[in-house]
């Protein structure tokens, strides 16, 4: 779902850029992270006065899912466990994390983990599916739009 969401966001951005040459669109955004593309789609929709509220709502729903998306791509998923009658799985992130302590000292750590229950994952995936459906509707609408 996440790759399809990112693909649709890219297509919508390309349409909002509205270049005569599709390759120019591609070169402008091909290296962008999801975070950069979310900011860009908001700016472009505002600039084009196209579905600003709708796009802003999609972005605000998608931002909380970024950690889960990053976990799927970069995370180290551990074995499934049962805790308090719930099926759980932990995902570790082995990238360096920088945090500030209460005394404003920067602390470094390499390992961060997040606990997910199957219920948590189901809920997140339902949200991702809803976002995907909204992006598909938006793509259908924008594909018929002519700005000039």
Predicted region positions:
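Acidic, Ser/Thr/Gly/Pro-rich intrinsically disordered interaction regions
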Residues: 11-148
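N-terminal signal-anchor transmembrane alpha helix
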Residues: 6-10
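Conserved N-terminal beta-strand and adjoining loop/helix that marks the start
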Residues: 1-2
